[in-house]
Amino acid sequence: MSAQKPGLHPRNRHHSRYDLATLCQVNPELRQFLTLTPAGEQSVDFANPLAVKALNKALLAHFYAVANWDIPDGFLCPPVPGRADYIHHLADLLAEASGTIPANASILDIGVGANCIYPLIGVHEYGWRFTGSETSSQALSSAQAIISSNPGLNRAIRLRRQKESGAIFNGIIHKNEQYDATLCNPPFHDSAAAARAGSERKRRNLGLNKDDALNFGGQQQELWCEGGEVTFIKKMIEESKGFAKQVMWFTSLVSRGENLPPLYRALTDVGAVKVVKKEMAQGQKQSRFIAWTFMNDEQRRRFVNRQR
C-alpha cells in the first residue's frame, strides 16, 4: 500500500513513496545511502548531501529521461517533487486562456541554477521550450553540461548570462522575443549572515555537525540578496512592466505568506491587470507562487494563439 503525499498536484509523478528498489537499479550508487527508519522501513539518508544528489540523479533519469545529471559541490540540490509541482501548476495557469495546456509554450526561468531543474521537468512533461538566465558563470557551465550531455535538450533549452548587476529581465528578454510565462525561485534571505543561520538550522534539524552537508548551504546568489525575497520580487515586478506585451504571465515563488501584502501593493502600483496566487503543499511544507499579467482575457487568448 503506497502512502499519498498530501497536497501534490494531480499530475505530479511523485505521489507515492519512492520505489527505492527501482531507483537503485536506475542509479546503483544510491544503494550505499539507504537506511532503515525506526519503523524498519527502507529510506534514504537525507542528511547526507551525496545521498540527496544520488536520489535526484535516479529520479531525473527514471521519471524525466535525464540520463546524465550532476551539480558541483556547494550548489543547492533541489527536491524534485516540489519543483515538479510548480511546473504543473504553471501548466494549469497557461491553460486558462484556451482550455488546453499549450504544447509549444516558451518559458523564461530566472535563475536557472547549476541544476537546471525546471527546464528539465518542463521539457519532458509538456514539450516546452526554455530560456534560462543566470548570474553565476559556474552555475551556467554546470547547467550547460547537463543540457549538452542529454540528447535533444540542446534544441529545447538555451542559456543566457545576466551580466547587468541587479537586473532581472533587462538584458535577458530580447527586443522581439515573446514568452508565455516566466518562473523564478528567488533568493530568500536578506544577508549572508541570515543565509548562514538558515543553513545552520537545517544542519541542526538533520543532526549534522558544522562541517557536514555543505550542499545544504548553496551559493550566495541562490540564498540571499540585499533586502531578501520581497525586495527581489518587487524589482521583478517593477521591471516586468517594461515587458508587458512580450510576456503573458510573470510568476515567482513566495516562501512566506506574510510576504504577499507588500507584493500585492507593488502589483497594484504597476497596473497589473490580473493577479493569481497558487497554493502548493509538499508533505508538511507549504509554498505558493504568485502570477501577474498586464493582458486582459482577450489579449491572453490572442497571445496563446499567436504565430510562433
UniProtKB/Swiss-Prot annotation:
Cited Gene3D superfamilies: Vaccinia Virus protein VP39 (3.40.50.150)
Name the record gives this protein: Ribosomal RNA large subunit methyltransferase F
Domain of life: Bacteria
GO annotation (BP), single: rRNA base methylation
Further comment: Recombinant protein is able to methylate partially deproteinized 50S ribosomal subunit, but neither the completely assembled 50S subunits nor completely deproteinized 23S rRNA.
Entry similarity comment: Belongs to the methyltransferase superfamily. METTL16/RlmF family.
Role, per record: Specifically methylates the adenine in position 1618 of 23S rRNA.
